[in-house]
Curated annotation (Swiss-Prot):
Residues 26-44 have a biased composition (Basic and acidic residues). Residues 35-46 are annotated as: Interaction with COP1. This is Transcription factor HY5. It comes from the Eukaryota. It comes from Solanum lycopersicum (Tomato). Interacts with COP1. Residues 1-25, 47-58 have a biased composition (Low complexity). Transcription factor that promotes photomorphogenesis in the light and positively regulates fruit pigmentation and fruit nutritional quality. Probably acts downstream of the light receptor network and directly affects transcription of light-induced genes.
Amino acid sequence: MQEQATSSIAASSLPSSSERSSSSALHHELKEGMESDDEIRRVPEMGGEATGTTSASGRDGVSAAGQAQPSAGTQRKRGRSPADKENKRLKRLLRNRVSAQQARERKKAYLIDLEARVKELETKNAELEERLSTLQNENQMLRHILKNTTAGAQEGRK
């Protein structure tokens, strides 16, 4: 009897009980697998909802209009419940842990790339040092040849 009175008050904003039972069951089955972490861990508020809406869990389909009116003002004044604070803290810790793990993975990938670049640059540096040594030896030999050639040409003029 009380459910009929409650549903007639909220009839303008909610579907009829037959629509609610058929469509909400289907809608709930579709939505149930897609609930976010917030929805799964949320403690249902007894008075924080508008008159005639279903309960926060959305599982029973019973209206919470007449049950939670007295605690509506006190719940909002007190702020978050300890369970909500704990859930929020745990969620923050989990996000932080995931973020830290991702940062460690990025750092590891960066260091691997950096080490590969170091090896590449060391190899290139060794090749360049070898080439420098070869060119210096060649330059020294050419200077010696030039010196001998110019010295021999000067003796030939005399």
